[in-house]
Amino acid sequence: MENRLEELRKQHGITQEELADILSVSRQTIGSLENDRYNPSILLAFKLANYFHVTIEEIFMNPEEEQ
């Protein structure tokens, strides 16, 4: 699943480690999300959306819907 996580994180001026600490996950989880190697749980998706003050759909895009 494609996402804008890295873009949003950089816009907010925080590192992967800082975001991981805020969300109580590992830095590796954030890296895997940013590189499309991991799909988040619904709870983590909501935490990310709440932190960045956007909707889940503004972070995560379903490539199948774009076709």
Where are these regions (language model features)?
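Short basic helix-loop element that most often maps to the first helix and adjoining turn
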Residues: N3-I22
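Short, charged recognition helix plus adjacent turn
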Residues: Q11, N50, F60-Q67
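Residues in the helix-turn-helix
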Residues: E18, T29, E58
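Recognition helix of helix-turn-helix/homeodomain-like DNA-binding domains
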Residues: V25-Y38
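Short, basic-rich loop-to-helix N-cap that marks the start of a DNA-contacting helix
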Residues: R37-K47, E65-E66
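DNA major-groove recognition helix of helix-turn-helix/homeodomain DNA-binding modules
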Residues: L43-E58
